[in-house]
A protein has these predicted regions:
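Short S/T/G/P-rich N-terminal loop/turn motif that feeds into the first structured element of a domain
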Residues: 1-49, 56-69, 76-96
Length: 96
């Protein structure tokens, strides 16, 4: 399994709108081949938002890269947010 972690900077006053826009984008991401799930992490005080999406394998995460970037940009455009970083990782095991 592989994970893509994206970190965003959002105006804290626009966080609720950003979450709504990312929820909509997430529905489209979920339709991409090899998608296995995802999570959103948020710090309402400082405007940090992180998305973590899980993918079946390296090929799936690579295939999704362009579309995922388009969806991120579309979601952030509505709230003047910025993508601070996007990094992919291998997931060797699940805790627990």
């Amino acid at each position: 399994m592989h994970a893509r972690v994206a970190r965003y900077g959002i105006d804290p006053d626009k966080m609720v709108d950003a979450l709504e826009a990312l929820r909509d984008a997430g529905r489209e991401v979920a339709d991409l081949e090899g998608y296995k799930g995802g999570h959103v992490l948020v710090d309402y005080d400082d405007g940090t938002l992180i998305t973590l999406t899980l993918w079946e394998n390296r090929a799936a995460i690579d295939r999704s890269e362009v579309r995922a970037a388009q969806l991120r940009q579309r979601a952030l455009r509505s709230v003047d947010g910025e993508v601070q970083s996007v990094t992919c990782y291998e997931v060797p095991f699940e805790l627990g």
